[in-house]
Swiss-Prot record:
Its main location: cytoplasm. This is ATP-dependent Clp protease proteolytic subunit. Belongs to the peptidase S14 family. GO terms for biological process: protein quality control for misfolded or incompletely synthesized proteins. The active site is at residues 113, 138. PROSITE patterns: CLP_PROTEASE_HIS, CLP_PROTEASE_SER. Keywords: Cytoplasm, Hydrolase, Protease, Serine protease. InterPro entries: ClpP, ClpP/crotonase-like_dom_sf, ClpP/TepA, ClpP_His_AS, ClpP_Ser_AS. It comes from Blochmanniella floridana.
């Protein structure tokens, strides 16, 4: 086992040990549930931290499980993320569009980069920011190295991905593609109210509806 692989699971173990548990009485006696499992029963999913493949697979599995439990009732996605890998984020995005239930999205803390993209991808009319949350949009990041031919191939692919994200952001925000291209050239920060005006979310929530 590699050092990085071992360190990763030490990190997971440490964080799991910090998750609160709740003891509930059942017909078979007391049973301890971690807080996230209890919230999942209420159809609440969290996108917390960097978006990468491991996390994305968990999010996808939870969304599909909740659809199988009830294909009509809304799913609630709470986002507090600095962004992350485009391919991981797109796997979550595609499942959000694929499943039958409406998906409400909520920005708590921050939704940056791919986090902002997923925030905007919720069901229209059901996308929210909490009052002191922040949103940041920008173009996909890429780091290229290797042979010149490979660099050219990857550069072309990055431009394709960038344009695809621009088109999808235009679709979900109602902005023109030209406005999206311009605004996403550099880091663009928005407050909760500014995110509503931009079309990334539909309203600011200070109290649960």
């Amino acid at each position: 086992m590699s050092y990085l692989y071992d360190s990763y699971f030490q990190y997971i173990h440490y964080n799991v040990s910090m998750i609160p548990t709740v003891v509930k009485q059942t017909s078979r006696g007391d049973r301890a549930y971690d807080i996230f499992s209890l919230l999942l029963k209420e159809r609440i999913i969290f996108v917390i931290g960097k978006i990468e493949n491991f996390m994305a697979n968990l999010i996808v599995a939870q969304i599909m499980f909740l659809e199988s439990e009830d294909p009509v009732k809304d799913i609630h996605l709470y986002i507090n993320s600095p962004g992350g890998e485009v391919t991981a984020g797109m796997s979550i995005y595609d499942i959000m569009q694929f499943v039958k239930p409406n998906i409400s999205t909520y920005c708590i803390g921050q939704a940056a980069s791919m986090g902002a993209f997923l925030l905007a991808a919720g069901t229209t009319g059901k996308r929210f920011c909490l009052p002191n949350s922040r949103v940041m949009i920008h173009q996909p990041l890429g780091s290229l190295h290797g042979q010149a031919t490979d660099i050219a191939i990857h550069a072309t692919e990055i431009l394709k991905v960038k344009e695809n994200i621009n088109k999808l952001m235009a679709k979900h925000t109602g902005k023109s593609i030209d406005v999206i291209r311009q605004d996403m050239e550099r880091d663009c920060f928005l407050s909760a109210d500014e995110s509503v005006k931009y079309g990334l979310v539909d309203s600011v929530l200070s109290k649960r509806i």
